Curated annotation (Swiss-Prot):
NCBIfam families: gatB, PRK05477.1-2, PRK05477.1-4. The gene is gatB. PANTHER family: GLUTAMYL-TRNA GLN AMIDOTRANSFERASE SUBUNIT B MITOCHONDRIAL AND PROKARYOTIC PET112-RELATED, GLUTAMYL-TRNA(GLN) AMIDOTRANSFERASE SUBUNIT B, MITOCHONDRIAL. This is Aspartyl/glutamyl-tRNA(Asn/Gln) amidotransferase subunit B. SUPFAM superfamilies: GatB/YqeY motif (SSF89095), Glutamine synthetase/guanido kinase (SSF55931). Allows the formation of correctly charged Asn-tRNA(Asn) or Gln-tRNA(Gln) through the transamidation of misacylated Asp-tRNA(Asn) or Glu-tRNA(Gln) in organisms which lack either or both of asparaginyl-tRNA or glutaminyl-tRNA synthetases. The reaction takes place in the presence of glutamine and ATP through an activated phospho-Asp-tRNA(Asn) or phospho-Glu-tRNA(Gln).
Length: 472
């Protein structure tokens, strides 16, 4: 039996307006090679100037994971040649990063586990190579975009733990609002270092790095395949030949990893302090950055202060957008538990395909009005589902307008309800007698008949109240 050893390196693209060492924009999707300048292009004489906002965002992350924030950190040159790296070196941090010795906690199958964060350092992103059939193109728009590289301790023991760690990290980064962490656009990328060892052994065996994984599903599949490949090689006696220190890519079509190149050691990058950049010396006020409420803190508040079930609270903190939507709902002085039901169950049940809470056709304000109409008795909860479905498809229609159009406004007029109840009681005199002789369950029959005659428009609370009076 083998134990799996996994360490993860995450590159989070920081959402600064400009690049880390120049004033070029960081916007995604621009025409190739338009967000560039002499610094991005590594033209002679162009010097880097550090972006202060990138430093602040790195500090915010450090505080969120209970890390040590170094008052002095150093930028180094990481030397390697690749077409999308104009300087033939990357400005990064090596032995003195801005953040180190952090932690976060994951929950897998009901068990909490602490995962150490070795370090988080600032660096610049490379450009992008676009490979055609007979040639390759280079787009340097991304070159110089600020990255925060977050390195975990090799303490993850399964693909499930790795995904739980990444989801937690992704959530923290989004709630801090330091990155949009959009995996499809490459602003949250992961490299997984995977090795195996016999259970009980403490030695670290040959690790394989799987590069640029950009979805939770692919991360899980890549790790599972790599563990299977290494385990089979060990059992076949070919481990030393098959498992070498290398970088592998994940084939998303066939769900296998393939060899890309040999894995470099740190010495091969010839790190040395960048002579164009002074060490970063942080004043105390930099360390006093206030960070927003994080997912775990929100969850505790939702449970303790609002009386929400833990399972519902988990859904509410599953994304920054979901959390903001809920906070916007309860800010309208609505019942929190009613808000949870209409958000987590009813609205989320309608969001399919490309629709998410972020681009929901029904916003928090509109859903809030619907919940108010349930609370004030204008419509029943059952009718409200029809109203929600209607405004979901007809986005220009407001809640009150939809209620009128659909004819779903509840009747709360006592005289109208009393007239119908009188008819039902007179038509069912035998059942009235049975009820009065002790058959209490017949009360539901009278309620049902009244609601049926009222075509669902009667206020159920009023119906119950009047029936109790009439039946004694």
């Amino acid at each position: 039996m083998f134990e799996v050893v996994i360490g993860l390196e995450v590159h989070a693209q920081l959402n600064t307006k400009t690049k880390i060492f120049c004033s070029c924009a960081t916007s995604f999707g621009e025409a190739p090679n338009t967000n560039v300048c002499p610094t991005c292009l590594a033209l002679p004489g162009a010097l880097p100037v550090l972006n202060e906002e990138a430093v602040k965002k790195a500090i915010a992350f450090g505080k969120a994971v209970n890390a040590t924030i170094n008052k002095k950190s150093v930028f180094n040159r990481k030397n390697y040649f690749y077409p999308d790296l104009p300087k033939a070196y990357q400005i990064s941090q090596f032995d003195i990063p801005i953040v180190e010795k952090g932690e976060l906690f994951i929950n897998v199958k009901g068990e909490n586990k602490r995962i150490g964060i070795t370090r988080a350092h600032l660096e610049e992103d490379a450009g992008k190579n676009i490979h055609e059939s007979n040639f390759s193109k280079v787009d340097l728009n991304r070159a110089g975009t600020p990255l925060l590289e977050i390195v975990s301790e090799p303490e993850l023991r399964s693909s499930d733990e790795a995904v739980a760690y990444l989801k937690k990290l992704h959530s923290i980064i989004r709630f801090l609002d330091i990155s949009d962490a959009n995996m499809q656009e490459g602003s949250f990328r992961c490299d997984a270092n995977v090795s195996i060892r016999p259970k009980g052994d403490t030695k670290l065996y040959t690790r394989v790095e799987i590069k640029n994984l950009n979805s939770f599903r692919f991360i899980q599949k890549a790790i599972e395949y790599e563990v299977k490949r290494q385990s089979e090689a060990w059992e076949d006696g070919t481990y030393e030949q098959e498992v070498v220190q290398e970088t592998r890519l994940f084939d998303t079509t066939n769900l296998v990893t393939r060899s890309m190149r040999g894995k470099e050691e740190a010495a091969e990058y010839r790190y040395f302090p960048d002579p164009d950049l002074l060490p970063v010396l942080l004043k105390d006020e930099f360390l006093d950055i206030k960070i927003p409420e994080l997912p775990d803190e929100k969850k505790v508040r939702f449970i303790d202060k609002l009386g929400i079930k833990e399972s519902d609270a988990e859904v509410l903190i599953s994304s920054l957008e979901m959390s903001r939507f809920f906070e916007s709902l309860i800010s309208q002085n609505l019942n929190p538990k009613l808000c949870v039901n209409w958000l987590n169950t009813e609205l989320m049940g309608l969001l399919k395909g490309e629709l998410t809470i972020e681009n929901s056709p029904v916003d928090a304000q509109k859903l809030g009005v619907l919940i108010k109409r349930i609370e004030d008795g204008t419509i029943s909860a059952k009718a409200a589902k029809d109203v929600l479905a209607f405004v979901f498809e007809n986005t220009s229609v407001e809640i009150d307008e939809a209620i009128e159009k659909l004819g779903l406004k509840q009747v709360s007029d006592d005289s109208a309800i009393e007239a119908v109840i009188e008819q039902i009681l007179n038509a069912n005199a035998d059942k009235v007698a049975e009820y009065k002789s002790g058959k209490d369950k017949l009360f539901g029959f009278f309620v049902g008949q009244t609601m049926k005659e009222g075509k669902g428009a009667f206020n159920p609370a009023k119906v119950n109240e009047i029936l109790k009076t009439k039946l004694g």
